[in-house]
């Protein structure tokens, strides 16, 4: 018939236990006959769909209407194939799939009838159809064979005798077949089921990780179905023979998935080999069928690799041959088996394209016999032609094939390489029966027999071997005759052979002691009832009596397997002889069976422990030991039964007869007593132990005496030296000079400053507790808690008081002794579910973490019952949540807790509202009653209602839920401070103060009026507002005032607090400039002016003369505080109220009524009036002079912002970036390959610093042979960044140019090495990745000479870079669109006077285009609409800015110093379970300290702004009427005002000096009172600076031209820095001569103010080292040390990333030295650097000015002398430059960008020249 395609079906099974335990997901979808698979690794990818003949959905339960049962599969596939078999076609069904996919279940099924597979159902229906046949002319016969292919070897599963591997042969007619494979005739389905069961038991299975009963072999169950029909008319019979092949393939597998090892791995390799070959065959057949219609010419690729595997060889006819074939692909639905399932689907899809040409097998036997006869005739003719006709001239069909000739042929074949046959049947008399194939006798055989005496076997063999092709012809003739005899075998003979094989199998099993049921099923193992036998005894009781050996009648031989005679019992071992012993079983006269043991010569055989050399009669129960290891017990059932009958009362032995009994018996009989031996051995060991112990004790005692003697000698030496040292110290003490008071003050200042530094301790806390924070977040994510944890720093300031529960215990004890607040590390808990934020201490975090772990463990135990989203989790024992109520307090403070909590929770009257002498008005009564009523509603406490029913609440016996805290309704909006200095004069003032949050954010403004009133004065009527007419009395007791815990007078002054509130070491504004004596003098001056000391005690000298009559000591004074309005408060706060209190009375507060907030429209009118009466004391006067009233504004959220963050349940916490912009990633240096490993040397004192401007270029080889710089893309717009646009596969060179100012210490010697590595496609560096490091060949390194006389140094080196040596795909291919390649470059350079190389590291960004691509730089939007992009060749470079420090090597120091340098383990890198769910989140590190520092400075600035605004408002209100004494009393406020906010004392000096320099006459902005208020030190410095400035500018700026005459403006570039301020002659204008104070004070402070300035690359351990104080040095180190002195410096280079904030950009004109021309350049100010470009389109930085080391000078006299308006000067260490702006406004903007303080001072001076009228 015509070709038909292979029918393909797929079937998906349910999840197995392994997949269920791993919570696998189903990735298979079926719709009709279409099957789709989803990629679990990329769910967004479209599913892959396949179409098959059948798609069976068996993943669900049978109740599913789409479920495909076993019967449905058989009805679709099996019935159709059975019908084809009855039609006469060959049929094949095979199952394919991965291991454990359900192939064996589909093909074989299970024992239950409803779960039978295709094979049992097909066999059963086959015999049903046969039995239902009513045609008498039809007869049927069924033959079955069952084989397995295991490790490419074929085994017969039905014949127990065929234990070896069968050979696969190929016959020209039959094709591939298995030689000697058993074909058993069956007459019923029961016979087939029995054979199938027997074969399945013999099949090889094993357990793997993916399948507990994995089929380790391919099984082929073959049914030969013959239909014979007798035609009565013609009396001819016709046959149709169908071959039904049912194949169960072994599962494909991967070693890593199945965990295969050893034998399992070898099996899997063979399985995969055969399945791979099967796939190749299927693919080849599919391609052949596809190409048949297109091209009929056979190609070389049409070869089908059938012979590559035994499986495909045997299935050749079934795959694309004469067969109807069906394939069932078994699928696993689990996502963890995605790759295997997809491979199976592709196999099945290819198999659909195979076409088989099946034909009906009409009478195959007759045709086959005829063809075989022709083949035999042809072979005989061939032998006769070769002269062997006398040997084979025999009719093969005249006799059976099983005679003695068969043995001859076998012997002949096995000995064909010998000349003599060693067999008993080869005597000359028997040679007549040894015909070829044992066919019938013939005249030829008689002639052969008559010539027996003359012809020998040797001659016949010689004739056959010597004849060409004779051996092969004999072999093929033998095969053909064997097949003919098999075909001519009648059906009855086949049945008899099958029955004989079955009887042999049962006999063999019975001989082994295995009982068989009547139906042929195995019953079990039994102990023989009559036959004597041996059972083994083993040391392991479980292994005893597992082996049973029968002693047969007659002789039973025991020996080794390689003995000459066959041994009945085969043993192995070193002491087992080839023939060890003989058991002789005979019957005596009485019929009793007697067994005698006869040992062979020199064999070791023991009976009951005695060695026997002569025959011994055995009794039942005797112990027999053969050799040394084989122990048996002899059992004689009949003999034992007879003895029990004779002595029925015989007691059973008290000890069981086992292996131990036999061994002990053997030792006893040989005279060895084990107990005695053990006791003897034990005594010997005890004696040995005692001897060794005595020796050890003696040795220990001797060592102790030796050490004691040494210690005594050392003690004497120490005492002697200590006496000498004491004598020396006494002498030295006599010579010491006592400290002066000034020296004591210096020591006290230094100790207090050292004690306040907390950088290291805070860093240790952050690093040491990071692992706890990470674990808490990981548990929160895994339990789906919407709670995030992150570190936060809290400092107890006026704006941000720290709750006492967050302070450590030891800190609380020493709090009163500490003059300035401490900073604590806390944990910010963001409850995204409830919209609340809490702060936990580290101890509380650790306590809660224990409960979290317990909760996590419980969740794992009862995961199915977890109710994360239920209501009970809000108030249950959940350690993630603090107790949350409907109203919350965010950022609580002691003041708020003290006033609100006490007023709302405590019902006792407040002393503020009820005192002995005060009259509480009705409004006050109403307020108090309202507050008492409000007490029941302000706090929602549900701990007693349902906490007991929550999980874990029963753990706490005290009834309090430890997971929740009480939180009040209102949250703190912000705080404001109002000073009371106007009460000194007294004048009324209305303040508009900023409401500042704890984070330094302005949340609104508050208008407050403060005025002194008479005692009986009525309050004004504000309309509908509140009118409070009562008077509250507040006491200011001197003793209580001094002892109370609030900021002291010294702390409230910014001059001290700004310095003392520093938490980072060396971060004080004046830390690098102001010496301790200057600091102490400043403190003393401030204290003298304010009338206070450091300890807070009052020194009120001349008090009565300085204050007015209204503030007499002891008198009553009344003043009024009116809260007018609040404005600018965000609408998210619903209700707003305000309360205020005094600092020392934080528990007594005055509160307004809440008002509805309608947004940013009209302000909220409180109009709350409060009269306050006090008794005038020294404390009160000092308070109104120096301290404010605290105003706190509260509200509650309508909807908390955290709710928006909590909408995503499983989002991991993100790192906080509140203040600093995201820093650009900087890589560590690439390790050198040619240099020794350099350790990070501890850096000591810094000798000098330089700014380096480095240009990086990558040049490519052009067709002209020159190397041209590659194009650089600068569209990012940020400085020091750019992308190299390179061509693929072109030679390149890397050029690096270093530019810096000339210095005596800095000389480049050579480039030691240039290395590149860390190739990646993302900016971040993967530290775990292993990348090849390539060292480049340096071709040139030299210093360049500038075209003009320049003071800068240009050092350039060039290296060859072959990118192919990296062997990186990223560098070898064209970069895909949108991707960039990053590479790290490190240059190791050698410097003079340095002990190790300096390292310059740069991350280079690249994009590779095709080799012939034309590359042009992209144009940004700005350039697109502008005048074009700069195409200058020198624009193709990337810039880097570096800071080079030349430092001394740090001394190891004292042990205390070494302890302070301890290495703290950063636990943030430690792994915790579940960390991978955090998606890259990390705990905050050292940067948090810097952010908090900036936060504190921001709060301090806001505070100082309010103080200054108050002072200016008061001064404007008083006008010129302010007396001198009152002006002096206000000086503390002035000294701590804006001038001291962002600068240090030196900045004030400079400002004053600058103003004096501008107008040295009496027409200065300050009047004579201001000048007289300067202290002597300030006057001295001001005079010195004035002289220098006046002297210089009177020279008409000539010295400026002289100092910079050796360079042009184009040379302005990196400025060499030195932390010192060098001294120069006053005759020359230099940076240090004109600005000695601002170099390291004002500019450095502004540098520190800007976060971008601190974005340097540093490791976690180095993050704080860059902020160390650099000691001042007066002269260059090399000049001081002398040129002949050998110097050992350590270079330290750090890359500096410019800030992203642009302060100002535009064009400026630069004055060229010694020239009247001005050069125009484009300037961008990114603090602390000024970047200079040729134009606004120039992308490359041509020069930089470091503002932290430069001085900006401005003088109107200078402009008048030079006749150049709008000019100012910038002085650096090496040069001075004149700059000119476009107009006056532009100049002010540039001055503000360069130096904000200078610009503010100028504006203030200009505003004072034209004073405005005072406003009231």
From Swiss-Prot:
Positions with biased composition (Low complexity): 432-450, 1620-1637
Enzyme class, broadest EC rank: isomerase
Lineage: Eukaryota, Metazoa, Chordata, Craniata, Vertebrata
SMART domains with a match to the protein in the record: FHA, KISc, PH
Protein name, UniProt field: Kinesin-like protein KIF1B
Domain FHA: residue ranges: 556-612
Transmembrane residue ranges: none
Residue sites binding ATP per the record: 97-104
Span of domain PH: 1701-1799
EC number: 5.6.1.3
Region ranges (Interaction with KIFBP): 270-350
UniProt cross-references to InterPro entries, sorted A to Z: FHA_dom, Kinesin-like, Kinesin-like_KIF1-typ, Kinesin_assoc, Kinesin_motor_CS, Kinesin_motor_dom, Kinesin_motor_dom_sf, P-loop_NTPase
